[in-house]
């Protein structure tokens, strides 16, 4: 596998990626894309392929240089640069022992509190330590602005509207509050929406940020998390506003949203104005079926099912990737990747096989 990836290199081309996302041209090769790679995966790749060997470990910029080097080696045109860290909002979290075997184990894995978040009352809302854009540490983004190669781009995730409302209230509490205290829910949507609008504007002020990527899980296997009416009235208008900011600043608006979103897909495409949809699961809607339904209206990203990658051997993975590409590369608007993220529980070899088969496709 090491030999194949090294002998079949691909070079980033962010301009072609942008044309793919806008469905302006049929790609000349397969472009990989991911919401993000877990830290453990990136570290494993860097050690396996000797990407750290000539770096100065005492250099404070080592981590940023490695972000570029790892993603460039893997063939990505854009990659996530986390600016808003997971602890920027004060949330109730449930750490549990990570069950990943071997060197990719991270010790603990944090799960969202489903029942009661830090905000339950108007008093909690008033006393909550609301973060501001002014409090962000932008040094990593400023460094990328000066040092990121011109054929690459970066992004951070934005527009976690429903997700953050859910985290702050707790999903169970949200379901009650929609009926018992809608004004509190609306106040949360307003506060969170304004924060992410400001953050989207900030991201657009950096030339190195090539795309605006909203990330907001809105569904589960059989339905949306809350009613489509609630989503249309309280959540999607904020995504529309973020998409408008992105488009006004010459960026495509991508959305990562897990779950069965069939009831709001037309809204996402026609009213929000998304350029690309990410996150697909075989048990909900395989990406090949999604491509047949939606590819004339929106670009589709990823879709190699994470559960499948975790459980399958090389021949099956190669076959699945090739079958997916035969459908999704027939026209415009597709990039190869996992159905969700490159999580640390995906076997590294399986992930690399997926990438390698993508490199082989047009050869």
PLM region descriptions:
Residues 97:
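Active-site diphosphate/adenylate-binding microenvironment
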Residues 81-93, 160-162:
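Short, glycine/charge-rich beta-strand/loop segments that flank catalytic centers
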Residues 57-58, 75-80, 120:
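N-terminal substrate-binding region of glycoside hydrolase catalytic domains
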Residues 44-73:
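Active-site-flanking structural segment that lines cofactor/substrate pockets
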Residues 1-42, 46-55, 101-112, 116-363:
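Active-site loop segments of alpha/beta catalytic cores
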Residues 63-83, 202-207:
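Catalytic domains of carbohydrate-active enzymes, especially glycoside hydrolases
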Residues 69-74, 91, 143-147:
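Short, charge-rich binding segments
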């Amino acid at each position: 596998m090491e030999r194949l990836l090294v002998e079949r290199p691909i070079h980033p081309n962010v301009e072609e990626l942008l044309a793919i996302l806008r469905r302006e041209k049929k790609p000349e090769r397969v472009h990989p894309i991911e919401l993000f790679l877990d830290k453990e995966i990136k570290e494993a790749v860097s050690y396996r392929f000797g990407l750290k060997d000539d770096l100065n470990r005492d250099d404070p910029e080592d981590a940023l240089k490695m972000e570029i080097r790892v993603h460039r080696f893997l063939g990505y045109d854009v990659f996530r640069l986390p600016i808003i860290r997971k602890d920027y909002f004060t949330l109730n979290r449930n750490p549990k022992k990570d069950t990943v075997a071997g060197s990719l184990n991270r010790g603990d894995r944090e799960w969202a509190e489903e029942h009661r978040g830090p905000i339950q009352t108007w008093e909690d809302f008033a006393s909550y330590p609301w973060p501001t854009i002014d409090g962000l540490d932008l040094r990593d983004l400023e460094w990328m602005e000066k040092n990121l190669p011109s054929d690459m781009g970066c992004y951070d995730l934005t527009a976690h509207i429903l997700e953050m409302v859910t985290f702050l209230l707790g999903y169970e509490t949200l379901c009650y509050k929609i009926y018992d205290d809608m004004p509190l829910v609306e106040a949360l949507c307003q506060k969170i929406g304004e924060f992410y609008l400001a953050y989207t504007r900030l991201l657009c002020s950096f030339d190195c940020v090539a795309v605006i990527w909203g990330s907001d899980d809105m569904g589960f296997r059989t339905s949306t998390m809350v009613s489509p009416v609630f989503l249309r009235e309280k959540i999607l208008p904020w995504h529309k506003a973020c998409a408008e900011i992105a488009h006004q600043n010459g960026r495509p608006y991508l959305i990562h949203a897990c779950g069965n979103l069939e009831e709001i897909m037309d809204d996402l495409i026609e009213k929000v104005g998304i350029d690309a949809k990410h996150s697909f699961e075989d048990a909900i809607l395989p990406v090949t079926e999604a491509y047949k339904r939606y590819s004339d209206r929106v670009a589709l990203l990823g879709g190699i099912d994470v559960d499948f990658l975790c459980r399958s051997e090389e021949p099956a993975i190669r076959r699945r990737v090739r079958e997916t590409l035969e459908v999704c590369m027939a026209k415009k608007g597709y990039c190869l990747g996992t159905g969700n993220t490159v999580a640390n529980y995906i076997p590294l070899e399986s992930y690399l096989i997926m990438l390698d088969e993508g490199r082989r496709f047009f050869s």
